[in-house]
Amino acid sequence: MEKKTIELLAPAGSWEALVAAVNAGADAVYMGGKAFGARAYASNFDEEEMAKAVYFAHMHHVRLYITVNTLVDDSELEALSAYLLFLNNVGVDGLIVQDLGVIRLAQKIVPELPLHASTQMSITNSSGVDFAMGAGMERSVLARELSLKEIGAACSRGSEIETFIHGALCVCYSGQCLMSSLIGGRSGNRGRCAQPCRLPYKLLNAKDEDMLQGKDAGQYLLSPKDMNTLSILPQLIDAGVVSYKIEGRMKRPEYVAVVVDAYRRAIDSYLAGDYNVPEEDLANIEQIFNRDFTTAYLERRPGRTMMSDRRPNNRGVLIGRVAKLDKNRNKAVIKLDKELHLGDGLEFWVSVGGRVGTTVTDMLCGGNSVQSAAPGQQVTIDVPNGVRLNDRVFRTLDSRLMSYAQQFFGPDAKKRIPVDAVVTARLGEPMTVTLTDDEGNVGYGETDFIVEAARKRALDEAGVRKQLDRLGTTEYFLNSLIFEHDENVMVPMSEMNEARRMACEALDAARLNAFAPARTAVHSFSEQLVPQAHKAKQHESVLVVHCDSVEKVNAALQAGAERILFGGDCFNHQLPSEADYAKAAKLVRKAGRQMAFATPRIIKEVQLAYFDKLFTLWEELQPDFVYINNNGLWPLAKKHAALNLVADMSLNIFNSQTLQFWQEQGAAGAVLSPELTMAQVEHLVSVSPLPLECMIQGRLEMMVSEYCVGGSFLGALDKGACRFNCAEPLFLGDRKDARFPIVTDQFCRMHILNAHELSMTANVQHMAEAGVAALRIDGRDYDAARLGELVALYRKILGGAVEAPENLPGTTRGHYFRGVM
């Protein structure tokens, strides 16, 4: 395999991290600006820094991708458009995007700028890659939940495929997580995830009993280990992946340096035909940051072995145990299993009280003060309060490794490009300077001054070399010099410096153009950012009820539901049969109501054929609508012309550009993101080309995950077949005593629901009057009797039979009146 087909892609949340990535051997770097990126808490880059970064990266033949991977509100489209123009004109190599509205807008105003589908787009199958290509994506970043075989299938579609190889994992499918949003108003889809998955939780039953009490389990039940693929990197390369992505825009530059350095060596060894990873690289990777390591879902579906349930952050490396304590308990003898150096940071996993840390500032070995100590030796160091005999000692910071890492981005770390110089000085002619880099690019400069005979000191090669060697502010260093000259000539130093500067600038231009030819600059556009507001069509809003059993369909119809949405992710753990779909359709038709079917939000490769067949069945049943929740199912469903397709909630519809995208895709309707406010909903209704739907009652899904906490901790999932009873009520309990229901769908995926039901009884009439075409009750977490009561209540409110009550006790109005950050 040629090297050009493999791209090592590094993160950069700061200038130092960018330099570290380039110097350590990255082929490409991804980073974010001050807005519209999914890591809003990183330092990120302003426009001046971005331009500087493009120059620096391209000079070293490193590609630069910019994250524009948040959901965007209509009020931000003007600023976004200006940003897109800037990114196009400054010469970045591509954008990583989530929002289909951003994709549509970028294609309209900066059509030459390559677009990559972010992992936030939840591409989970090869048909999802087809969808992304159809939407204009040159590359798809796959969901981290795919196996090697599934990645291979995605790679077969003719698009570039990017996959994560190292770093932090999300427990939820990226782009499908509302946990941070619903708990604290900080939306991961808007780049402000507060990482509540790294907090402690209890696993509770219906009686609020801790199911893990007394068991060998930690509290961080949603905190995965870090991904590390060095053991299986050849299999990923063989699968056909083009870009190998290291996670870590929030990480310090030392982390970037060490991880990129190790993966660079690993990839190069594969390309050389002798794959190996030195033990030193494995140790460095572990030391720089780890929550312990996993290959995630690449080799199999893991359970508890994927989780860092005892610690959600850097655990360091175990280097020994406390062998002795002095009587004051402030000095300890540590028996070392690994070397220790002055300046190292240590953490003691103490028996009582958790963990305490210190930095080694003085160390005795055999009674002598030492700078370092080897494995097997015993050293005496100062320790903090709380340390006891036999406590484990972890090194969380290795001073020598940090010094090594800082060589990649410190003041002396500049990675320079060798140039060969030819200087001519002929009497009666300008002096010329020709610089040639290691790839044959040439820069030329000459003096305004005409070379004269020397009156005093003649110019010699040493003098020329001294001036040509002054390349400190450039990206070059002088590799060789040829000085061709007449005898006894002179040229002022200032003139020579100017010719050198001209040659450097010309070489810059040649080198940059050879790597990334300039695209057409765009300074204005005619695209209308937001459609003209129109008066919403006057019609009665349809009450939609989402059911996952025929029993609930019957209850909802009897209570007055006008549209039944059947199927999708079924919280009763039962896969609806063909007979179930037929029964539901028959009941709905008999009642004279609208029938709709729903797909799950996650579809893996092996399930594509099943759903292709299911669409044929649905076509025969003639539903009024089919709700699509997975982008990979859109191309399959479009083949069935009789189906009226609706873009459902999981597709993250947040702005009018996205609504126009779905109209152009042939959608018959769209369901808005639950992260929108009432004001945003009203605005979108006024400009939408499609009928819109909003959720008004039920528990919002906070997470969907291939990981199952019940199966992992109670069902011995890691040992093979899961023994956990999915019908057993299960909850996550947090530090504030909130209880989040856990349900398992028909594909054994875990869904975590909000602790509070969404309820809009007090506002549903207003939503109907505002023109929301369909109002949804999610009945999947209710029993049939309770669902019937709720449907009847909303039917009466919308019909004016009862005065709209205040919201039901213990419920929430979600984001309708608070929004997200």
Spans of features found by a protein language model:
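Active-site pocket-lining/capping segments in soluble small-molecule metabolic enzymes
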Residues: 2-123, 127, 141, 145, ...
